[in-house]
């Protein structure tokens, strides 16, 4: 995956993980999974509900947070320069 893709994914998933936000994850086959994001890496998301499931990112269509989440995609140098 390109570095540009990580600039959106990582801060978003990290905010969901840090704040223990309940999420609905829709898979490409239409199945809906619910829980909290426990961890993630380049290829998978660990979703915790009654059990922890490893969900491959290529199978994910949409992640819907249960509430609004604030996350920043600005790099520290960009934030300081006002860009």
Curated annotation (Swiss-Prot):
Molecular functions per Gene Ontology: RNA binding
UniProt keyword RNA-binding present: yes
Keywords carried by this UniProt record: RNA-binding, Stress response
CDD domains linked to this entry: Hfq
Alphabetized InterPro entries for the sequence: Hfq, LSM_dom_sf, Sm
All residue ranges annotated as the Sm domain in the record: 10-69
Matching Gene3D superfamilies: 2.30.30.100
GO biological process: regulation of DNA-templated transcription; regulation of RNA stability; regulation of translation, ncRNA-mediated
Recorded GO CC terms: cytosol
Subunit annotation: Homohexamer.
Family classification: Belongs to the Hfq family.
Functional description taken from the UniProt entry: RNA chaperone that binds small regulatory RNA (sRNAs) and mRNAs to facilitate mRNA translational regulation in response to envelope stress, environmental stress and changes in metabolite concentrations. Also binds with high specificity to tRNAs.
Name of the protein in question: RNA-binding protein Hfq
Species of origin: Paracidovorax citrulli (strain AAC00-1)
UniProt lineage: Bacteria, Pseudomonadati, Pseudomonadota, Betaproteobacteria, Burkholderiales
